[in-house]
């Protein structure tokens, strides 16, 4: 071990020690590495996108370490990263399909799980799928997808569901984490994903975190922030805005604890400070050339059920549910909505729930007028989150925050994650971040920009770029656009008219439709929907007590697997080939390192095997979707294209002529397993009852090269498959082999330069866009004004959330993650070292509240809302330090099933759930 490796190992050991975790053996000392094969890969966990080096010997993973050549993490890992390999070897890893059966071996929803063959599993799955499709059509099936799909997995399942089955009822768990960011991007820029990159950290003077505990959720990025702060601590400033105190505050110059939901008001305060008190700070040249001012309706509801008296609601839920129809304006809303002629006590009827994304161009003077109420005095009283903090001190913090943004030559990066996205006005608050940066001309520049951080490893690369959302197609295209469907049908080589023009159900609607009997077949991939969805009691009851069939592809028996009817054992990250796309648009590929455990097979294999079970004639004839829409018969067109109605979906969508051009004799695979291509030495008996010998063509390369056709020449360009196996990722668009660091800036982005050769910026996502004009209340014209590659500066008001603390439920509840565990803990709770470090989810709370409710440190309490209750252990002294009036409970622990308590309200535009705020009471268990 050389000095460099020794230093890195020492740093890793220190990190483990600080977390109370045993050091991985591969880092504890220099080891004999004879016969080890090291290869680059990617970390399985968050959206940072760290590079990993994986060592194998004799078909086993013997070590993992940070990749010193990876520009993201530069050889470092967080504590989860060092245990990437161990997630694959939990004692209860599922190795064979499991089906609920009765004593006679027949499927029985009330039966017990029993090991079955792949053939038996697929036979039952096919039977149940056909039954549901015949009864309910394309809307009767549902797929819970993931921001943890590999890119090829997401592309394959989208092609099967959208192109083969003609359904769009597929939605990823990224709906829970990034949907508000996506809609914010699309509404503002006309194109998805951040303008900047991680290089901004080393170039900026100011890092402001909004609802982003980067120290735990993006720890490697936070190490880069810390390094930047230490380089010049006097000039570089860090501000942390949060609803409770976190580790991210440890290096912050300013910590601002605000009341949940009032980030909306704080952004407007900053904008008001710019517009009214520092108009000289407005970059008028930038704004005039590159922006238009816009607004939209406020009567949009809260993304709950339209039927406010739905029979499945508990009586205790009805008062919150009623706010979907109308709300009585509070004193604060009377101030913030005065520009619409409204006042406190007025009833706001939510008439725009059907078109919450509608918006129009307004004049700058309208924009300025709407900001008028957001004075320092008003916002400070509204937003101060710690009742025991002095109001004048809080005002000083808000003023200092605004001053940092406004300072003439100061570079500023605003980072956010779930605090802004998991929000019933998440799209609005995303748009507000761009509002401030645009006004100051501090966007799409090195070291300056509003930067949405992704939570999952491929929420960007798969869920967003591939388009596994219920309304999307690859490369930012949408299913409702006829031209986009036409492009997709041509690339997929399927008949015109095959793709359903009606978007499918988003994540929470699939759950609600399951409860209502409108969805009866669900397939779960790479996530844990029955643990990760708010108001979980409803959905568990629906899964177990109704006439439906739930398939869960999973390596472990998490909550979703336990409520399912069929569990399919799934290969994990280093047991398959794959690719992820991270938060800075960096795409990274890896090779299969080892064989899957037991009879587990990859998700891609499962999709392709399922596709073998169905023929074109089963779905490409006339298909009734609902009372208003019938899909056309496209079989004649298919025959004209050279297909036969007897062809399987596998033959047409996957094992087609184009796919066969990708040879199994490819040097990229030399010396590596590829189970999908060759089969493997396990001789797994596949879905047809025969030993699976491989597909005989380079599946992953074919899927990649077909997928990249969508983005070429359209600002989403990706490199070819082979290139990614030679580099440590590339940030798209990749044009002529060169990655793009700052989009929309003509110095760095060839698309911006092409669109505006004589200017500095082009927000070309809006090149062909147009909007009607109006005033603050409504659109007043019918004629549209061309956007001409200009971005939008939105005005969005503060409004209360649908549920706030009251006499009966006096506390705010916030949920989230912890450093040591990933999401629902299905993988990390099975790593002994991580489990020992944090074996249970605690209820972090302020001791003042403890004294108020007669609760002491380590007491077991009930946390109860209108929807349900759970037990948790109290911690007054832990890493998370809420102010009086708020508790924080992470959701990784299935024994502290906090999503039984949470409210399933969503942002009406993005359909993303707000996990960050609901009202609860606590008492001793």
Swiss-Prot record:
The keyword Nuclease does not apply. Its cofactor is [4Fe-4S] cluster; Mo-bis(molybdopterin guanine dinucleotide). One of its GO terms (cellular component) is periplasmic space. Gene3D superfamilies: 2.40.40.20, 3.30.200.210, 3.40.50.740, ADC-like domains, Dimethylsulfoxide Reductase, domain 2. Substrate binds at residue 891. Its EC number is 1.9.6.1. Binds 1 [4Fe-4S] cluster. Binds 1 molybdenum-bis(molybdopterin guanine dinucleotide) (Mo-bis-MGD) cofactor per subunit. Predicted to be exported by the Tat system. The position of the signal peptide cleavage has not been experimentally proven. GO terms for molecular function: 4 iron, 4 sulfur cluster binding; electron transfer activity; iron ion binding; molybdenum ion binding; molybdopterin cofactor binding; nitrate reductase (cytochrome) activity. Keywords: 4Fe-4S, Electron transport, Iron, Iron-sulfur, Metal-binding, Molybdenum, Nitrate assimilation, Oxidoreductase, Periplasm, Signal, Transport. Residues 1-30 form the signal peptide. SUPFAM superfamilies: ADC-like (SSF50692), Formate dehydrogenase/DMSO reductase, domains 1-3 (SSF53706). Belongs to the prokaryotic molybdopterin-containing oxidoreductase family. NasA/NapA/NarB subfamily. PANTHER family: PERIPLASMIC NITRATE REDUCTASE (PTHR43105:SF11), RESPIRATORY NITRATE REDUCTASE (PTHR43105). Component of the periplasmic nitrate reductase NapAB complex composed of NapA and NapB. This is Periplasmic nitrate reductase. The lineage of its organism: Bacteria, Pseudomonadati, Campylobacterota, Epsilonproteobacteria, Campylobacterales.
